[in-house]
C-alpha cells in the first residue's frame, strides 16, 4: 500500500487492529449504500482504499466505547 502511508494512518488511529476494523466497516458501508463518499476526490478505486484515505484525511475517526457495555454476542 503506497497511499496513504501506514505512518500517516498511525497518527490518526492508535493501533493497526483498530484501523483495520474501522476501515473494513466503512468499506462495507460504502459498498452497501450509494453516495456515502465523504471526500471530493479519491486516489483509490476500491472501497478499503477509500476508507483508508478518509482516515488519513481525518474525516473518519474512531469513537471510543464505554468498556462496561455488554453486547449480545458477548453473553
Curated annotation (Swiss-Prot):
The lineage of its organism: Bacteria, Bacillati, Bacillota, Bacilli, Bacillales. HAMAP family: RNApol_bact_RpoZ (MF_00366). Keywords: DNA-directed RNA polymerase, Nucleotidyltransferase, Transcription, Transferase. Signal peptide: none annotated. The keyword Transcription applies. Promotes RNA polymerase assembly. Latches the N- and C-terminal regions of the beta' subunit thereby facilitating its interaction with the beta and alpha subunits. It comes from Lysinibacillus sphaericus (strain C3-41). GO terms for biological process: DNA-templated transcription. The RNAP catalytic core consists of 2 alpha, 1 beta, 1 beta' and 1 omega subunit. When a sigma factor is associated with the core the holoenzyme is formed, which can initiate transcription. Belongs to the RNA polymerase subunit omega family. The gene is rpoZ. One of its GO terms (molecular function) is DNA binding. This is DNA-directed RNA polymerase subunit omega. Pfam families: RNA_pol_Rpb6. The keyword Nucleotidyltransferase applies. Its EC number is 2.7.7.6.
Amino acid at each position: 500500500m503506497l497511499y496513504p502511508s501506514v505512518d500517516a494512518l498511525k497518527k490518526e488511529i492508535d493501533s493497526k487492529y483498530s484501523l483495520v476494523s474501522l476501515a473494513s466497516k466503512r468499506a462495507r458501508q460504502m459498498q452497501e449504500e450509494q453516495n456515502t463518499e465523504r471526500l471530493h476526490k479519491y486516489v483509490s478505486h476500491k472501497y478499503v482504499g477509500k476508507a483508508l484515505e478518509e482516515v488519513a484525511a481525518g474525516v473518519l475517526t474512531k469513537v471510543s466505547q464505554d468498556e462496561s457495555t455488554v453486547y449480545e454476542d458477548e453473553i
